[in-house]
Amino acid sequence: MRELEEVIILRDELEAIKLHDYDGLEQTEAAKKMGISQPTFARTLDRVYKKIADGIINGKAIKISDDPNQITSTR
């Protein structure tokens, strides 16, 4: 079996996607729940969408992490 490269999704990115796409909240409402500005929320969504797309398109494992210093690795 080949080793998979990982895409790391941080907890705040997971929370953003949950609030917006799963719970159906508008960006302004979701940003308030997270205690961040709407522009920051929009950047977070953009970042996590790109990570998820990278994982799906390139066959990478998607890992959820609490560590913002963790980088993409090969497993």
Where do the protein language model's features map onto the residues?
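Short alpha-helical "packing" element that flanks the helix-turn-helix/winged-helix DNA-binding module
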Residues: 16-17
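Alpha-helical residues within the helix-turn-helix
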Residues: 32
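Short helix-to-turn junction characteristic of helix-turn-helix DNA-binding domains
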Residues: 20-23
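C-terminal flanking helix
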Residues: 49-56
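Short, Lys/Arg-enriched anionic-surface-contact patches
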Residues: 1-11
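Residues within the DNA-recognition helix of helix-turn-helix
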Residues: 44-47
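Helix-turn-helix DNA-binding motif, specifically the short coil turn and the N-cap/start of the second
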Residues: 2, 26, 35-40
